A protein has these predicted regions:
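Conserved glycine-rich cofactor-binding loop
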Residues: 12-14
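A glycine/serine/threonine-rich, flexible loop-to-helix segment
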Residues: 45-46, 179-206, 245
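Substrate-binding pocket helix/loop in short-chain dehydrogenase/reductase
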Residues: 97-98, 102-110, 191, 198, ...
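Active-site helix of classical SDR
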Residues: 121, 156, 164
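Alpha-helical segment proximal to the catalytic Tyr-Lys
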Residues: 126, 168-173
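C-terminal substrate-recognition "lid" of short-chain dehydrogenase/reductases
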Residues: 127, 210-238, 243
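Short, small/polar-rich loop/turn modules that mediate ligand/substrate recognition or access, typified
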Residues: 172-176, 232-233
Length: 246
């Protein structure tokens, strides 16, 4: 990926940071978006720029601001001269059981998981078409098999799967669009629904009998970014076999 340019949303931590490190090691230049994780974003930028100077830049933005999304693309192109890969990774995740769902929950979860990827992909499409690039969306295995009490999140990720396939048709043949559906990779922070007993139960239902790691998703990101010139409109489950047992 030497000379290629990647825009990663939610790139400061967890799966985003793991993907950033792997793509950077492959030679890519990175625009890393963050919303509130400034400390982590700057630390990652310093780490990677120490390896290859001026190869990583940061952009802070609230992805709920639809009108501001094109500026992420414009700033990436202004900084690095183009855009080859858009990784829609940023996501909100929390329970919304029926009876407790408010409009604010709907707007937040739909906004980060579906609306932002849609409008950011639309803004990036002209540049990606010029450079025959790709879009990679981080979906979820629960897009097809909804998780109890996570109604809005599951619906939003189902929409993102549909968006992935729709964009693959709309942007072909110049742009490839694929998705990655993680399983039990990193446990949500501060969510009591995922206590130790729940975690062990989930892991026991994976075929590989272990939780995954952000690097597992990063490897799939690199696969779609670098090695799949004849794959588009597909969703790859990286879940230790859990979705086959749900």
């Amino acid at each position: 990926m030497h000379g290629k340019v990647v825009l990663i949303t939610g790139g400061a931590k967890r799966v985003g940071a793991a993907s950033a490190r792997l793509l950077h090691a492959a030679g890519a230049n990175l625009m890393i978006h963050y919303r509130s994780s400034a400390t982590e974003a700057r630390a990652l930028q310093d780490e990677l720029n120490a390896i290859r100077p001026d190869s990583v830049a940061l952009i802070q933005a609230d992805l709920h601001d639809t009108h501001g999304l094109p500026s992420l693309v414009h700033q990436t192109v202004a900084t690095f001269g183009g855009l080859d890969v858009l990784l829609n990774n940023a996501s909100s995740f929390y329970p919304t059981p029926v009876g407790s769902i408010g409009e604010k929950d709907w707007i937040d979860l739909m906004g980060s998981n579906l609306k932002a990827p849609m409008f950011l992909s639309q803004a990036a499409a002209p540049e990606l078409r010029k450079r025959r690039g790709c879009i990679i969306n981080i979906t979820d295995i629960h897009a097809e098999r909804p998780m109890k009490s996570y109604v809005v999140y599951s619906v939003a990720k189902a929409g993102l799967v549909g968006l992935t396939k729709s964009l693959a048709r709309e942007l072909a043949p110049e742009v490839r669009v694929n998705g990655i559906a993680p399983g039990p990779i990193m446990w949500p922070e501060g969510d009591s629904n995922f206590d130790e007993v729940s975690r062990q139960r989930i892991v026991s239902h994976t075929m590989l009998k272990r939780a995954g790691d952000p690097s597992d998703i990063a490897l799939a990101v690199r696969f779609f970014a670098m090695d799949t010139h004849y794959v588009t409109g597909q969703i790859l489950a990286v879940d230790g076999g859990r979705s086959a047992k749900l």
